[in-house]
From Swiss-Prot:
Cofactor section: pyruvate
The protein's name: Phosphatidylserine decarboxylase proenzyme
Superkingdom, taxonomy of origin: Bacteria
Pfam families named among the record's database cross-references: PS_Dcarbxylase
UniProt source species: Bartonella bacilliformis (strain ATCC 35685 / KC583 / Herrer 020/F12,63)
Free-text cofactor note: Binds 1 pyruvoyl group covalently per subunit.
Record membrane topology: Peripheral membrane protein
Tagged with keyword Lipid biosynthesis: yes
Free-text function comment from the UniProt entry: Catalyzes the formation of phosphatidylethanolamine (PtdEtn) from phosphatidylserine (PtdSer).
Annotated site residue numbers, Cleavage (non-hydrolytic): G189, S190
Amino acid sequence: MSVFRSIRDGVVPIHKEGYPFIVAFFVASLILGWIWDPLFWFGLVLTVWCIYFFRDPERVTPMNADWVVSPADGRISFVGLCVPPEELDLGKNEMMRVSVFMDVFSCHINRAPVSGTIESIVYSPGKFVNADLDKASEFNERNGVVIDSKHGKIGVVQIAGLVARRIICWSKEDDSVAAGQRFGMIRFGSRLDVYMPAEIKLRVAVGQTSIAGETVLGSFDSDITTTDFRLN
């Protein structure tokens, strides 16, 4: 294996959504440095942070139709039964909700929690309160995705936060998705809520760190030890 290939394989890819921001931060660094030298280094630090923010690493996803994986990197901020948002059209019965809060240092690529077909995508305008607050699921700008899976409908809601002002969803209605597949992102701090059937067996707890496409949030079977995996 060549040295160049080793270096290439060791570098985490950057998502193309970040290119304009990275260029803008670097140009701003040059301009600030022209005004006052120390400002260049300040701008350069922000540029490096921007590169880090838009990283898009590959993930090894467990391929088990009975499991629900995390759609986001971050901290589990809520676990419990809740009535899903009306716009998801998932009924008025309580479903199990797991919320994942992403801070500005989290990887913000969002991944499908299950394999299935996207039944609906619903965008709802709203406010930009702290995404870590429970009321954010009701009042903040958000984008809801409903996936028809082996175990019924699973809802995923991308929620904007104080800093995040841009929700991106690349998938479309009627698209087929695989668990762990990239479907969108939210820029600069946010939250994802996952709504699952109430009978699911939870595998996470509040305060736990989750990895998108890898951490199992819950399962519909009792066996959590064996499965196949896929690189995403």
